[in-house]
Amino acid sequence: MTDISTPKGLAVLGAGKMGGILLEAFLKHGLVAPAHVFATVRQTSSERRSISSAQITLGTDNRAAAKDADVILICVKPLAVSAVLDEIRPELNDQKLVISIAAAVSTEYMEKRSGGNVPVLRAMPNTPSMVGEGITAICKGKHATPQHLELARKLFDAVGKTVVVDEKHMDAVTGLSGSGPAFLYIILESLAEGGVKMGLSRELATLLAAQTMLGAAKVVLETGHHPALLKDTVTTPAGCTIDGILELEEGKLRVTLIKAVVKASQRAKELLFSDKEN
């Protein structure tokens, strides 16, 4: 892959939920021509409906998809990665870039399974990518270059923000931004339930909770101020907010959320596929 500013051919192996989201975004932003996209699914008839472009090549043969691609995006479950790498290994070389979004599969493991000096990257996108508000953490293996990282950043920027991290932090990323949307949905649902308890319709309560969460997050991102400082700007002496915060503190919300991220991160570490695995 001499020119790696944009993929000449892209293989998406496992174009299911997240794979399909990424593929649609790449096509929408013109990052790859539909005629140069090769995607695999388990059942072409059922999955075709989730992919808008009929110009892509859709099938079930991973090796065939990887053959003419210079960027190969693996979007299968962690336990399926080894089988996929074994299948496409004859088509891999140092001119192709392999990117895996599978949690807990190390670059060392993928390099070993790929053979040779194949450039490998790990990526951890999250589900808000479906509306272009995701965040993806990427890290590179020993054969990947800064140019490979820039190509990956260009691709994943299509679904939100992209950050480069050391691989040792990928488990923490998984626990925070990977699992985080589920934690936030629970918080959002609970806020809405509070509104319902106080007489609001469920539709209005959900809208208020969702927009409030969105707006608060945007303030943090755009001002760069610490959340604690921003919290204090809402909290007036002897006001409503401080009474609500007291309830949150008594309910140990803060420590519970911290422990949720830690536990999810530890689980990712337990699942880790390293170069020591067969």
Language-model regions, residue ranges each:
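Internal alpha-helical scaffold of NAD(P)-dependent oxidoreductase catalytic cores
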Residues: Y109-P119, I135-A172, Y185-E222, R267
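NAD(P)+-binding Rossmann beta1-loop-alpha1 motif at the extreme N-terminus of oxidoreductases
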Residues: M1-T60, A64-D68, E133, V196-K197
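Small-residue helix-packing motif on alpha-helices
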Residues: V37, A65, V81, S201-L208, ...
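Short acidic capping loops at alpha-helix termini that bridge into adjacent secondary structure
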Residues: A33-H36, D94-K96, P119, E203
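Short pre-catalytic strand/loop immediately N-terminal to key active-site residues, enriched for Gly-Thr
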Residues: L121, M170-G175, P227-D232
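NAD(P)-dependent Rossmann-like dehydrogenase/reductase catalytic/cofactor-binding core
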Residues: T2-T6, A210-N278
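Rossmann-like NAD(P)(H) cofactor-binding subdomain of soluble oxidoreductases
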Residues: L22, T44-S45, A54, N62-I138
